[in-house]
Amino acid sequence: MILSVLSSPALVSGLMVARAKNPVHSVLFPIPVFRDTSGLLLLLGLDFFAMIFPVVHIGAIAVSFLFVVMMFHIQIAEIHEEVLRYLPVSGIIGLIFWWEMFFILDNESIPLLPTQRNTTSLRYTVYAGKVRSWTNLETLGNLLYTYYSVWFLVPSLILLVAMIGAIVLTMHRTTKVKRQDVFRRNAIDFRRTIMRRTTDPLTIY
């Protein structure tokens, strides 16, 4: 059941990537593919790959979306006009996503839902069960954010520079718009550029 729920939207979204006429839609359709694929990896027990898969690929989608919008000259006003048209579809997709989340999660992890009464406090304590076993994700997170935090921040700065470079490269400057060079305007001496014009007083006869 869970396999079909996760795999079916991934297949449909993968087909819509190739069939979408709007380039913006073809860029956005891989997001459900990566989301459902990370869910399948989570079911297989590969928690680290399930976490890193959407982070890396959705970041790449954000950069490609930036390139598509800036290189194809898509008007933002046209995108805003179509937002209301896709609100029902996005609402249905959001409800399906939340239904999947509540279907997968166990009731014991949600304290508001009715669960079985906790009777472990009435029994004797088994200390062997108190020993905590670290998962792969917890171990990598502990090492990454504790001992290798600097190496975690350096790639983020490199990606920031790459994104700024992409914006600068795809930015089109037109000659019709009047612009001012702020540095030259501040460097000009006003006493040499502004001339005082004196006029003779009018004489009335």
From Swiss-Prot:
It is a multi-pass membrane protein. InterPro entries: NADH_UbQ/plastoQ_OxRdtase_su6, Nuo/plastoQ_OxRdtase_6_NuoJ. The chain crosses the membrane at residues 48-68, 86-106, 150-170. Signal peptide: none annotated. It is an enzyme of class 7 (translocase). Keywords: Electron transport, Membrane, Mitochondrion, NAD, Respiratory chain, Translocase, Transmembrane, Transmembrane helix, Transport, Ubiquinone. Its main location: mitochondrion. It comes from the Eukaryota. It catalyses: a ubiquinone + NADH + 5 H(+)(in) = a ubiquinol + NAD(+) + 4 H(+)(out). Its EC number is 7.1.1.2. This is NADH-ubiquinone oxidoreductase chain 6. It comes from Brassica campestris. The gene is ND6.
